Structure formats: structure tokens, C-alpha cells
Amino acid sequence: MTFPSSCAPLVGISRARLPAWALPDGWPTRANGEPLLADLAFRDGRIAALTPTDQPTPGLWDLAGALTLPGLVEPHAHLDKTFTIERCRPAQAGLLAAIHAMHEDRRHWTRADIQRRASAALARAAANGVTHLRSHVDWFTADAPDAWQEIARLDTVGITLERVALVPLPLFREPAQAEAIARTVANSGERCLLGGFIHSSNWDAAAMENLLCSAARWDLDLDLHIDEELSEVSQGLTWLADHLSRHPFPGHICCSHGCALAAGSDEQAAPILRQLAAHGVTLIALPMTNLLLQDATFGRTPRQRGITLLHEAQ
């Protein structure tokens, strides 16, 4: 690879190898069927032109055929919890034990500790090509935690950062408190979303109603930790699908985890997925987390994988 002077503005890159799905129809190929390399011209931070080439273009960064991909998107992170594994070891297996261990670690969560760990995580993400990151931030009361403000103050090193208030569902039980939480999130600046931890251990239909109503009133999008369990009695996604069929939500909803869909039959899951798709709900899977924590018991091999129904949700 060859690069112009570091003082020169980046106006484009030459001889980039793009994946086939990123090339326009009719892109020329070599005799062996391999697509030609590409010159990309930039203007105002966007790709202004895409030109087939096999020769380096003077004045552009010459990538000499290196693979070139769009910036990575991390749709589900927890910057407030990063780099805690060395001091946070669950005594039991499974999700709820992991949550308990993380709550025990909160005694270390000074503002300086949060800044140090979250900054390191963002820097590592940027170094690995992440350009957009959404971080959930645990709330433990109706008041915004220190991490909510500290993560807002981070140097984002070129990453577009979103914050989601991850609030336990019972905190939405009282309408006035639900309204206060939504108001705080809405007044926290750009790229803030309302979220909730929704599980059979804390299920409350009235709190769900208050959560969605308050988010709608304050023009907030939602990203919900919902049905993160392999339990056929979990009700979150079923309730949400039914609620949206009667009360469409004005913003966008993401549902993270959704493991419970894999615990029932395809016949049970299909109508739920159809209703969620009809309302534009996005389903986010977290395979590494769910493979580790779902159906987990010390001394027993997990029988179920814990990954939500991604193929069926397409």
C-alpha cells in the first residue's frame, strides 16, 4: 500500500477490493470472473463516485487490492460493564447469577473507574473498525446513574455513540415514575433511547404499558432486553406483539435477546414474529452471551443453545 502525505486531505482511495454485494450491477470482471478493483472518491465525508480500475490513481491512497468494508456497527454493547471480568466472577451459572455478580461489582463503579473502562472499550472498538456503537447503561433507580453521564462525556474517537437507559421493568410500575424516567432520557441529548429489562422474574403487564406509553409521549425509540431466557412462560414478546397490533408505536423498537422464542415450537413463534415484523420491530441476537448464559448449570452440559430465531424472523 502507498499513501499520500499525512497532511493531504483524504479525497479517495484507489484499488480497493470490495465484496460483491457492495458492487453495482454490471461491474466489470477479469477473464477469471473476479471483479475489478475500485477507486472510491470522497466528498463531504461520503462516497461520491465508484470507478472500476486495476491501476493506482495518483493522489489517492493506494490499497493495492486490500479488502475494503463499510464501518462496523455494534448494535448492543454495555460500556458501563466492560473490563470487569477480572474482578467479577459469578458464583453460579446462568444469566441471573451473572447479573448478581455485576451488581456486586458496582461498589467499584466510581466515575473515574467508569471513564477508564468505557474509554478503553471505545478505543478498542474504533481500532477494530467500529463506526457506530449503541451502549446500554444499567439504571438501578428512577434517577440516572453516574454511568449515564460519564458515558455521555467520553471522547468517542470518531464513533457515533448511542445510549440506552436499561431500566428494570418494575421501575415503570407507577405511571408518574415511568414518565419521569422517560423525561430524563429525552432531556439527555441526542441519540438516547429508552430500554428495559423484561424477564419472567419481574414480569408486569401494567409496567410494560407505562413503558411504551411514556416512550411514545417523549418521542423516544425503544431497545428492550426482552425474554432473555429459555422459558415457555416468558410473556414479553407475546405481550408486545399483541399490544402493537392494537396500539401501534410511533417510533422504532429493537428487541434484544428474545431467547424464549427458541424454547417453544415453530407454530408458537410464527405468529409472534409475523406481528413484530408487521410493525417494523428489529430483533437483535447476541450469540456469544446467550450461548454462555442460557441453559447453564455447573456440572451439566447445556442442552439448548439459547439463540433467538433469526432465520425464521427474516
Regions found by a protein language model. Name each.
Residues 1-56:
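N-terminal metal-binding scaffold of metallo-dependent hydrolase/deaminase domains
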